[in-house]
A protein has these predicted regions:
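Active-site-proximal flexible loops/turns
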Residues: 9, 45, 157
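Charged, low-complexity C-terminal accessory regions
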Residues: 124-164
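N-terminal signal peptide c-region/cleavage motif recognized by signal peptidases
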Residues: 13-15
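Positively charged n-region of N-terminal signal peptides that target proteins for export
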Residues: 1-4
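Active-site-proximal alpha-helix that buttresses catalytic centers in soluble enzyme cores
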Residues: 20-120, 140, 160-187
Length: 187
């Protein structure tokens, strides 16, 4: 029993140290990016309306953040503030992402090509990859980027699977590709 407790304690300590190192990189290193899915939305819970997008910005028919999702986005914003980091946020135009970005970071930029499309829509996926890469290249620099988007899109950029609200930390190279450094989880 004592061995198991010690192992768990070491594992927790290692995760805290790893998170701290990633926060330091975000504070100090250029060309950093945090890729994250939107926090919990109605669609994450029941699978409905995940591809619906109201181009007017009124969110009609779209999946929206739950109460827990809004609270989680707020905790993410607080974590960035505690570490003295004010990122430039880039968001999918779909409401669950713009809500996450607005609550966590207040201001954000968006583009219609950053939305989620059906996995069978290879043209939509290619538009996303091209636009995301161009935006990462355009905004890479001293200020870290917070890229709020959808699981399938982040997976296509990084080959990493994320849970809602989980954050993937990386650096953007000269080609606009993301070199993954690790994950930060804020409960």
């Amino acid at each position: 029993m004592r061995t198991i407790f010690t192992f768990i304690l070491l594992l927790v300590t290692f995760n805290v140290i790893a998170d701290d190192l990633l926060w330091i990189k975000l504070q100090q290193d250029p060309n950093m990016v945090v890729l994250m899915r939107n926090t919990e939305s109605s669609g994450n819970k029941d699978g409905s309306n995940m591809l619906v997008w109201d181009e007017t910005g009124n969110c009609v028919g779209e999946s929206k953040l739950t109460k827990d999702g809004k609270a989680h986005a707020n905790r993410i914003g607080e974590a960035f503030a505690r570490h003295g980091i004010t990122p430039l946020a880039i968001s999918s135009p779909m409401c669950r992402c713009t809500e996450t970005a607005k609550i966590a970071f207040e201001e954000y930029v968006t583009d219609p090509d950053l939305r989620q499309s059906a996995s069978s829509n290879s043209q939509g996926q290619q538009k996303f990859l091209t636009r995301a890469t161009n935006l990462l290249l355009e905004y890479r620099g001293k200020t870290p980027i917070a890229f709020v988007n959808h699981g399938p899109n982040i997976d296509s950029l990084t080959m990493e699977l994320l849970n809602p609200g989980e954050m993937l930390v990386g650096s953007v190279n000269e080609s606009g590709e993301v070199e993954v450094l690790g994950k930060i989880r804020i409960e």
